[in-house]
Amino acid sequence: MSFADTLAQALAAPGRQAIPFTDHEGDATRPLVLHTYRPAQATPDSPVVLVQHGMMRNGDDYRDFWIPAADKHGLLIVAPNFDNANYPGAEVYNNGHVLAADSTVRPRAEWGYAVPERVFHWLRKAGVTRREKAYFYGHSAGGQFGHRMASTQPLDIFEAIAVGNPGWYTLPTLEKTFPEGLGGIGLGEAELLRLLAFPLLILAGEQDIETSGPSLPAQPEAVAQGPHRFARAKNYLAAGQAEAARRGVACNWTLVQVPHIGHDGDVISRVAASLWFDRTMPDDATLAGWAKGRGSAL
């Protein structure tokens, strides 16, 4: 059975699924699992949301964060899971395994950032979707993954990309080497202009302000971007605006500051869903209610 047939069969009925996926166009030695949810009313014309987990490698949880929105709006949710055994550490997951252990640049087809586009192409090949574009959401380490994906990959298949609370950012400059910047990995001015032109959505919890902890990147390049994730989000937008101004072009990014909310992948998922599919920001009282009694959700 081809993988297209496997997908079509698994997603023929509503509900949750966990579908093993070997990316033969990329690094076939590192399998993944696609955690999916299809509501009963979903059709091949329904929006597709690709969801990227954080450092806990919990794609099943991140899929579940999106189930209320999926049920409300008829969304197909697909959350690729990069497990710790096959994608150990930040270099192989957050940083896309762009660089080998000896710091040489790996083949571009094997970068982790190419996986979401190939997953979406398989969904189309399987007839699961007729949509030409997908939504992408990533939080925390998944937000690191997401903005680096937007920095390095063709963006034709993305309707929208939202990144929530990344720990630090790859700055939109060729003058700093990857992952601090985009230099040294075969990218050029065209890719940088493409990134600046894309309507990237940056979601930043106003209470994501811890200045130390095991999940907060603390290398000098990260600390230079600000003391905490909230400050680093604002620094990233400012860097994009400055690089665009230098070139006389627009920076089409948007930073949405989320009141009351800290490092919470569930609530930031709800905010992204509301902005995309309800076309509105949740009101202050709703956000305050969501914040009560919550800790971090990685």
Task: Describe each model-derived feature in a short phrase.
Residues 42-88, 170-171, 210:
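Short substrate-entry loop that stabilizes the transition state in hydrolases
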Residues 83-110, 215-216:
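Cap/lid segment of the alpha/beta-hydrolase catalytic domain
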Residues 159-246:
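The feature captures the conserved acid-bearing segment of alpha/beta-hydrolase catalytic domains
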Residues 267-276:
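Post-His helix in hydrolase/transferase enzymes
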Residues 50-52, 164, 258:
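Alpha/beta-hydrolase
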Residues 53, 138-148:
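Glycine-rich nucleophile elbow surrounding the catalytic serine of serine-hydrolase chemistry
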Residues 1-48, 58-61, 72, 104, ...:
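A domain-start/cap signature at the N-terminus of enzymes
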Residues 258-264:
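Histidine-bearing beta->alpha loop at or near hydrolase active sites
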